[in-house]
């Protein structure tokens, strides 16, 4: 579906997201654009992000709002003008706080938006506790105010709307073809990253207390006692990165832990990995676990994650507390790369539900 800038046939869509960084929502939007869906996008903050240029290459016009914490009123005036001047008839909100999304709905309606789509991607607001309370207070109001309610999973629906009734569960789209791992691709990836003959562990995501890279590092410390040639890769950036780097140094693990920063194309790292860690305090329906399964990689994740994300049998759920570090260690050490046939089977299983072209087509039908 191509947007009609004159507003005649196909309505114009504006997608709102937190940033244009490397998060799951942003990757979802990019995957949909690359699959042929057409929309423009607006970030909640003025900062430019790592995926913004890639989105623009797909024909997506990008906008930025004044940071809400700096000027609350200007934040909403910016949004009003973007919607009004751009003549966007559909506004697609992607966030995790019912109160702030409701305020965006009021602004969008005032600016002329005809249809509001609210899309839940998480199971709580990772910010201050008072924001969580506000979100709970406004869940029913948000639910009643939206024209279409979407969620990446049942738990995400319950968090944002307080119900999963009349909420469309829309899986996160990924590029499954790009994530297919043959023996040749795995060998080339390990050679390129200088990882031949080593057991490779990977965690993908922003450095934030919610993601618990510190827990992964404590697990890896135990792994390293058994396998000195093991390697841990933290792909991502964020406020906690220096803290984790210092922690690795204090543990004497710095030579075995890599920090490549934000990686636009993770397929090389998934192809090289033996296991992916995700010990998060909470997530919605994490794209990382879908991508890892599509690449045929064993996954270790928190019990708090929606268990329905295990579509291939490759995901193991464990409690992520101090008493369970040994259990994580044993499970990680048992992780071995799958055969090429099994990786292909896993990829095809994920592609049945989560291929970007399929999700893009479904969303277009829902929006119109």
Stretches with model-predicted labels:
Residues 2, 10, 15-78, 239-240, ...:
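N-terminal strand-loop element at the rim of the active site
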Residues 23-31, 199-222, 239-245:
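A conserved mid-protein helix/loop that constitutes part of the nucleotide-sugar donor-binding site
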Residues 70, 74, 158-161, 173-192, ...:
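Acidic anion/phosphate-binding donor-loop and adjacent secondary structure
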Residues 245-261:
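Nucleotide-activated donor-binding/catalytic signature segment of Leloir-type glycosyltransferases, i.e.
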Residues 262, 281:
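Aromatic "clamp/platform" in nucleotide-sugar-dependent glycosyltransferases that forms part
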